[in-house]
Amino acid sequence: MRRGITATALVAALALAATACGSDDESGGSKSSGELSGTVTWWDTSTVGSEDKVFKKIAEGFEKKHPKVDVKYVNVPFGEAQNKFKNAAQAGAGAPDVIRSEVAWTPEFADLGYLAPLDGTTALKDQDDFLDQAAASTKYKDKTYAVPQVIDSMGIFYNKKIFKEAGVEVPQNIADLKTVSKTIKDKTGKTGLYLRGDDAYWFLSFLYGEGGDLVDAKSKTVTVNNPEGVKAFKTVKDLVDSGAAKTDATDGWENMQSSFKDGKVAMMINGPWAVADTLTGKEFTDKANLGISPVPAGTAGQGAPQGGHNLAVYAGSKNLDASYAFVEYMTSVETQAQTAGELNLLPTRTSAYAKQEAADSEIVQFFKPVVETAVERPWIPETGSLFAPLVTEYTKVLTGQTTPEKAASTTGDSYRKLLKGWK
């Protein structure tokens, strides 16, 4: 998942300044007495105001289990965490003991030498229980550098009340999406779709729907500028130009969420991580008003990206034993069942889906088959860096500053500079 939330940057910055971090001596703990102790600093990147409260509460449960361990919880804005961690790790000061790493960041951090290998540690308890597609992003050069915390994909969130008022059905493909959006506008005056324009992760479903991809890692070939990529850029441009969708070049997360929660738009593309926040909106005081359906198919079929988050341990941590134990606790079956029940987040452990909390979550049950067929991103160190050049061109296309053809070509050129020796 890539959310790019930035609204809490100031709060997180203040918290970081005041928080002792993993590379500091005071983090040191000892297991010589058979009891864990010391400090574990955890950088969480979950949604502020909903997810963070639950994760902080769960982390406090670890402290109760291990009274001599102090977990310092810091919520770092998702859009800042990747570079903030790299800068701290490179400097050798200020990095946390444990970071919530977006799946694409993990191979990059491992390649840079910033993560502790976890094979043979308590962090990987019951390793065979993890879903194969969730575990794939944790491995780099035959070693395991993280533990899967949550897995996700994307779907269309829709307002059932608005759909009923307009007399429309859930769109199955892009043509349907345009027709449904026009009908909603004509009959209710509301915009059909909010298409987030400041995060290229929201572009991937359209790219995959046309049969395209960013790169082909096996052949080391850049593919974003293939005809399928151009078609995907044309598709998103047409949605905005036709009035089927509205977009913004900045503050996309906040604008998208508020527009949907307040009933100003009928649809948005989002994932399980957005459910808890969405249900706080006035339109969804009755939770049954929220509908979720697969992302509308493109000409090649329906495609949605596989996302998620891992928990990784900083290689320079002064308290590795407690950090390993914390990761094991935060990714346990019980913890994953709890987050499925309270936040509708998808577990990465097979056995967690048999727990009542996961079985009772309609959101989890909807997204589970979506995740099983979602498109994996290439697990290469550079994957996390592919989004910066892509979002620049994606935003330009949506705001009329460039053409789909030029956007695809420019993105491809940027990738070839980043991926040395690739075609």
Regions found by a protein language model. Name each.
Residues 164-166, 241, 372-423:
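Conserved C-terminal helix/tail region of periplasmic/extracytoplasmic solute-binding proteins
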Residues 2-18, 22-107, 297-300, 322, ...:
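Conserved N-terminal structural module of periplasmic/extracytoplasmic solute-binding proteins
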Residues 133-137, 290-293, 340-389, 396, ...:
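Long, aromatic- and glycine/proline-rich binding clefts that accommodate carbohydrate-like moieties
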Residues 181, 221-249:
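Glycine-centered hinge/linker elements that transmit conformational signals in sensory
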Residues 60, 166, 234, 238-245, ...:
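Extracytoplasmic/periplasmic substrate-recognition and gating elements
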Residues 106-114, 134-169, 196-218, 305-312, ...:
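Periplasmic solute-binding protein
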Residues 103-153, 178, 186, 287-292, ...:
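Hinge/lid segment of periplasmic solute-binding proteins
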Residues 96-99, 126-162, 191-192, 291, ...:
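A structural signal for short loop-to-beta-strand junctions that line the ligand-binding cleft
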